[in-house]
């Protein structure tokens, strides 16, 4: 008889922590959860706190909290004052010096939410990578989620970094985001930017593809149930497919003359279109951060200036942009003491 004598391998601290993090529980934690849960919790908590109690009087001269009479659509956590520049506005930093009230007044909550929100989104993306690896599937969900991360980082961080201060980023609120959109249009003519056009095409195209795909699958289910919905006929363990790709292909071939014949290509296309839209719009925002111009049809502007009877939709929009700038610059940045001479104020029959 042979007796094998061996030592149990000692499990280090890393192995113990790894086992605990990956334990099967109702809400999976994982290594990504160390980044995701604290940052997401703090970002959400900061936003609820700011919209409930914190004023924007000292940064924008506005009321922005429920305490001041705002509602869900008008409440916001506003960006720091322009004088703060690109400071991280740490609570213990030279601006607030540990004073929480002063920190809120100068816009510290916005920097807090923006930075923790960015890390929270990155943590959620890493969570999808981690779970995909543990389950044994490919990480396309995480790759797709890179689109929202790119948009958040470009709009809330990179754009104001290219401008004078965090002041020019969007505030965290519904009406505040709308104001930021008007700002982008007035100061950058954003709607005529080709990267914005590609972004719109990607997002709306993705919504259209989603609707078409869902309707087509519902139309070609192999077996319909006798209940009020179609889920009764589906079982998670069935070996056959739920709907007929062949029938769907024939249907769209008759309508368009061409149709997807391969499920992999079809679903990759549905992944690619909206993600490409998000990424291209993010690239466009980085261009705006650097004050790059897109389409300026100067010849039309010159002709419209010389000929009062010549006007295009482009020249009308340029006049609208001038109006936005003349109002928003003085209204939003009173500390700059902007004074606009009469010749730059909106004019012409477009307004």
UniProtKB/Swiss-Prot annotation:
| Positions bound to chlorophyll a PD2 | 196
Reaction catalyzed: 2 a plastoquinone + 4 hnu + 2 H2O = 2 a plastoquinol + O2
- InterPro entries per UniProt: D1/D2 (IPR055266), Photo_II_D1/D2_sf (IPR036854), Photo_RC_L/M (IPR000484), Photo_RC_L/M_CS (IPR055265), PSII_PsbD/D2 (IPR005868)
Record-level Gene Ontology MF annotations: chlorophyll binding; electron transporter, transferring electrons within the cyclic electron transport pathway of photosynthesis activity; iron ion binding; oxidoreductase activity
Q: Which GO terms describe its cellular component?
A: chloroplast thylakoid membrane; photosystem II
* Alphabetized Gene3D superfamilies for the sequence: Photosystem II protein D1-like
Q: Can you cite a GO biological process for this protein?
A: photosynthetic electron transport in photosystem II
Is Membrane found in the keyword set?
Answer: yes
Task: State where the protein is found.
Answer: Plastid, Chloroplast thylakoid membrane
- Keyword annotations from UniProtKB, A to Z: Chlorophyll, Chloroplast, Chromophore, Electron transport, Iron, Magnesium, Membrane, Metal-binding, Oxidoreductase, Photosynthesis, Photosystem II, Plastid, Thylakoid, Transmembrane, Transmembrane helix, Transport
Q: Where are the transmembrane segments?
A: 39-59, 123-139, 151-164, 206-226, 277-293
- Per UniProt, a plastoquinone binds at 213, 260
**Family matches, as Pfam families:** Photo_RC (PF00124)
- Topology versus the membrane, per the UniProt entry? Multi-pass membrane protein
Q: Binding positions for chlorophyll a ChlzD2?
A: 116
SUPFAM superfamilies noted in UniProt: Bacterial photosystem II reaction centre, L and M subunits (SSF81483)
Q: Which residues bind Fe cation?
A: 213, 267
Paste the cofactor note: The D1/D2 heterodimer binds P680, chlorophylls that are the primary electron donor of PSII, and subsequent electron acceptors. It shares a non-heme iron and each subunit binds pheophytin, quinone, additional chlorophylls, carotenoids and lipids. There is also a Cl(-1) ion associated with D1 and D2, which is required for oxygen evolution. The PSII complex binds additional chlorophylls, carotenoids and specific lipids.
UniProt-annotated binding residues for pheophytin a: 128, 141
Main localization (coarse): plastid
Please give the family membership noted in the entry. Answer: Belongs to the reaction center PufL/M/PsbA/D family.
Other comment: 2 of the reaction center chlorophylls (ChlD1 and ChlD2) are entirely coordinated by water.
Its biological purpose is as follows: Photosystem II (PSII) is a light-driven water:plastoquinone oxidoreductase that uses light energy to abstract electrons from H(2)O, generating O(2) and a proton gradient subsequently used for ATP formation. It consists of a core antenna complex that captures photons, and an electron transfer chain that converts photonic excitation into a charge separation. The D1/D2 (PsbA/PsbD) reaction center heterodimer binds P680, the primary electron donor of PSII as well as several subsequent electron acceptors. D2 is needed for assembly of a stable PSII complex.
Q: How does it assemble?
A: PSII is composed of 1 copy each of membrane proteins PsbA, PsbB, PsbC, PsbD, PsbE, PsbF, PsbH, PsbI, PsbJ, PsbK, PsbL, PsbM, PsbT, PsbX, PsbY, PsbZ, Psb30/Ycf12, at least 3 peripheral proteins of the oxygen-evolving complex and a large number of cofactors. It forms dimeric complexes.
Identification of the protein by name: Photosystem II D2 protein
Source organism: Thalassiosira pseudonana
* Gene responsible for this protein: psbD
């Amino acid at each position: 008889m042979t007796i094998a004598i061996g030592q149990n391998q000692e499990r280090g601290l890393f192995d113990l922590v790894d086992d605990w993090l990956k334990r099967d529980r109702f809400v999976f934690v994982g290594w990504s959860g160390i980044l995701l849960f604290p940052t997401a919790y703090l970002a959400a908590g900061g936003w609820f706190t700011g919209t409930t109690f914190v004023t924007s009087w000292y940064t924008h001269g506005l009321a922005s909290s429920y305490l001041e009479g705002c509602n869900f659509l008008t409440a916001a956590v506003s960006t720091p004052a322009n004088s703060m520049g690109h400071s991280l506005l740490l609570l213990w930093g030279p601006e607030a010096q540990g004073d929480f009230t002063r920190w809120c007044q100068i816009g510290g909550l916005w920097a807090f939410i923006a930075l923790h929100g960015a890390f929270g989104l990155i943590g959620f993306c890493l969570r999808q990578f981690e779970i995909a690896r543990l389950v044994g599937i490919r990480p396309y969900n995480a790759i797709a989620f890179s689109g929202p991360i790119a948009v958040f980082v470009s709009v809330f961080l990179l754009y104001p970094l290219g401008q004078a201060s965090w002041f020019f980023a969007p505030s965290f609120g519904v009406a505040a985001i709308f104001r930021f959109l008007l700002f982008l249009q007035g100061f950058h003519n954003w709607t005529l930017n080709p990267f914005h056009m590609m972004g719109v095409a990607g997002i709306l195209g993705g919504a259209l593809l989603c609707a078409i795909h869902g309707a087509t699958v519902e139309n070609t289910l192999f077996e319909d149930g006798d209940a009020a919905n179609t889920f009764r006929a589906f079982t998670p363990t069935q070996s056959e497919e739920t709907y007929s790709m062949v029938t769907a292909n024939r249907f769209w071939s008759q309508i368009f003359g061409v149709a997807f014949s391969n499920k992999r290509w079809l679903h990759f296309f549905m992944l690619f279109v909206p993600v490409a839209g998000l990424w291209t719009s993010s690239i466009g925002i980085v261009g705006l951060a650097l004050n790059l111009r897109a389409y300026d049809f100067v010849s039309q502007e010159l002709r419209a200036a010389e000929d009062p009877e010549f006007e295009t939709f482009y020249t009308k929009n340029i006049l609208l942009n001038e109006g936005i700038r003349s109002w928003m610059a003085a209204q939003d940045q009173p500390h700059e003491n902007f004074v606009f001479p009469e010749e730059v104020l909106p004019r012409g029959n477009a307004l």
